């Protein structure tokens, strides 16, 4: 694929992301940016190490069983590969390679294209998670036992197709407004869809708690509770990454403005930094709410510090009373509220039922 100089003006603002090194040297800001580049390279290696650590722990704890986990890993890997493309961009730029900032160089184009293809699915991750939960609600009868792996393939095929088409069009379109609009619109729809899914499952939950069970089986009630818990998790995840979901596309939108090359260079560096922090914060939030992951990570940390790990999962520290022992377990209901035990009342109720059963 060949390029000529006349194409530069057409594609100049559409690359992921173009940094004009020559202009930066002329204005005297390159040394400052070079320092930032080295920090970004260090962050990329942290992202790569963090990814390998997460995959290792997931393999040890068998975290590939649910559709949600499969979708997470299928989107997580391309994002990491996108940062590998970013690493190559930085190295070529620092080494004064023609492929580092020469838009007429085919290598520069393909690195930018592959980086976009790998990174764009990250902007659609919330939509993918919510879509899977709607399928879980629709197939309420047996979703716990039959998760229908083909659903993962369908969701990922749609996500990857949109990302691929967006990346190709991004490098030829005269404006990035439509791409940014799609990114933000899908994120907003994901928030709304998650809330509607929560309301629907909450109504199912209240029906299932009737004295007659509402006609729901035990498996259905479990799935309803699981959907509600996921809605709360989604809210925490969405709030944690909302800044990145909005600021990243906004940086792409700024490229359409008629601003100086100096500001565009700054915008490029800010965009790269946002994506790097996004790649660290998102998996951290996801894994922070995973008990199996936290337990295994603690074991690894303890082994590094040569501290013996206690394997008794249900160990209860000595308490002044039995009530404190029960309450120290911090058992929560479906909606995340802590259940407080009144041991005396619970014991009396238990023996009354037992006495009636023996009578």
UniProtKB/Swiss-Prot annotation:
The chain crosses the membrane at residues 33-53, 74-94, 111-131, 150-170, 180-200, 237-257, 266-286. It holds the Pfam family Sre. It is a multi-pass membrane protein. Its main location: membrane. It is found in: Membrane. GO terms for cellular component: membrane. It comes from the Eukaryota. Keywords: Membrane, Transmembrane, Transmembrane helix. GO terms for biological process: sensory perception of chemical stimulus. Belongs to the nematode receptor-like protein sre family. PANTHER family: SERPENTINE RECEPTOR CLASS EPSILON-13, SERPENTINE RECEPTOR CLASS EPSILON-13-RELATED. This is Serpentine receptor class epsilon-13. It comes from Caenorhabditis elegans. The lineage of its organism: Eukaryota, Metazoa, Ecdysozoa, Nematoda, Chromadorea.
């Amino acid at each position: 694929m060949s390029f000529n100089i006349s194409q530069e003006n057409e594609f100049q603002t559409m690359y992921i992301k173009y940094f004009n090194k020559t202009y930066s040297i002329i204005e005297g800001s390159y040394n400052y940016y070079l320092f930032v580049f080295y920090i970004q390279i260090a962050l990329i290696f942290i992202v790569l190490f963090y990814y390998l650590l997460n995959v290792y722990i997931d393999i040890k704890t068998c975290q590939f069983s649910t559709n949600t986990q499969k979708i997470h890993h299928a989107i997580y890997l391309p994002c990491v590969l996108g940062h590998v493309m970013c690493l190559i961009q930085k190295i070529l730029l620092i080494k004064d390679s023609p492929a580092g900032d020469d838009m007429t160089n085919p290598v520069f184009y393909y690195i930018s294209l592959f980086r976009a293809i790998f990174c764009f699915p990250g902007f659609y991750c919330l939509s993918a998670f919510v879509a899977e939960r709607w399928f879980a609600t629709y197939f309420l009868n047996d979703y716990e036992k039959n998760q229908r792996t083909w659903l993962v393939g369908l969701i990922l095929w749609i996500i990857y197709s949109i990302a691929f088409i967006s990346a190709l069009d991004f490098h030829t379109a005269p404006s990035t407004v439509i791409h940014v609009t799609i990114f933000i619109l899908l994120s907003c729809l994901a928030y709304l869809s998650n809330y509607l899914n929560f309301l629907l499952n909450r109504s199912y939950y209240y029906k299932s708690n009737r004295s007659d069970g509402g006609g729901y089986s035990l498996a259905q009630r479990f799935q309803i509770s699981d959907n509600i818990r996921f809605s709360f998790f989604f809210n925490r995840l969405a709030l944690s990454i909302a800044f990145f979901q909005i600021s990243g596309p906004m940086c792409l939108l700024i490229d359409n403005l008629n601003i100086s090359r100096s500001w565009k260079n700054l915008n490029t560096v800010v965009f790269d930094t946002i994506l790097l922090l996004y790649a660290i914060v998102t998996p951290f939030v996801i894994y922070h709410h995973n008990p199996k992951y936290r337990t295994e990570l603690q074991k690894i940390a303890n082994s590094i510090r040569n501290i013996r790990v206690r394997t008794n999962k249900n160990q209860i520290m000595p308490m002044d009373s039995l009530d404190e022992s029960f309450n120290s377990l911090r058992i929560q209901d479906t909606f995340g509220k802590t259940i407080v035990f009144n041991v005396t009342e619970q014991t009396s109720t238990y023996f009354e039922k037992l006495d009636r059963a023996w009578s």
